[in-house]
From Swiss-Prot:
Keywords: ATP-binding, Cytoplasm, Kinase, Nucleotide-binding, Transferase. Its EC number is 2.7.4.8. This is Guanylate kinase. Residues 18-196 form the Guanylate kinase-like domain. ATP binds at A25, P26, A27, G28, A29, G30, K31, T32. It is found in: Cytoplasm.
């Protein structure tokens, strides 16, 4: 068993304040898996925001845990009510981050972690302070292999995602941290170290 050295997060301490972490990556780079690992180790320190989307759940996804899956009509209703801090249309589907969801996580004394696309992360950066993390596959070839292995897209959809990944990769320099996910365990250790360091950064 590994020894863990970590100073407990104390949200009531005057130097501590809950933060918003954004984690973005091309489809297939491994962001969802890494965030699940983080959630298992630090359940009391942070909570993943529940993004809304109009797309269908993938086989491994759990409604109400990975996303809140809604109809086009429900998404439009939320949009009309200005419920979203950011929203995007991607591959014919809609994705949005609820401002109320982030506020509720902060009120609980935990950090909020938004697993969102690059465009959404950049919008959030322009509105509120964030800790922006970009996760990349080691190569386009590896990204394509992972998408094929995932098997949740048709060939046309997969090619669209691969083309879009080039645009996302070009925006990596707009993020504070970049993790090349060529080894899941090592990448998780890097992500964890970022989380712990930022958790105790003096923001005053």
């Amino acid at each position: 068993m590994k020894n863990k050295v970590r100073v407990p997060f104390s949200p009531d301490h005057p130097l501590c304040a809950p933060k918003l972490f954004t984690i973005s990556a091309p489809a297939g780079a491994g962001k969802t898996t890494l965030v699940r690992m983080l959630a298992r180790e630090f359940p009391d320190s942070f909570q993943k925001t529940l993004s809304l989307t109009t797309r269908a759940p993938r086989p491994e996804e759990i409604p109400g845990v990975d996303y809140q899956f809604v109809s086009q009509e429900e998404f439009q209703r939320r949009l009309d009510n200005e419920d979203f801090l950011e929203w995007v249309a991607l591959f014919g589907e809609y994705y949005g981050t609820s401002r109320l969801g982030i506020d509720e996580i902060w009120k609980s004394g935990r950090h909020a972690v938004a697993v969102i696309d690059v465009e959404g992360a950049l919008v959030l950066q322009s509105k509120i302070p964030t800790v922006a993390i970009f996760i990349s596959a080691p190569s386009q070839e590896e990204l394509e292999r992972r998408l094929k292995q995932r098997g949740s897209e048709q060939d046309t959809q997969r090619q669209e995602r691969l083309q879009h990944s080039l645009i996302e990769q070009a925006a990596a320099d707009k993020f504070e941290y970049v993790i090349i996910n060529d080894d899941l365990e090592k990448s998780y250790e890097v992500l964890k170290s970022i989380f712990i360091a930022e958790e105790h950064r003096n923001v005053l």
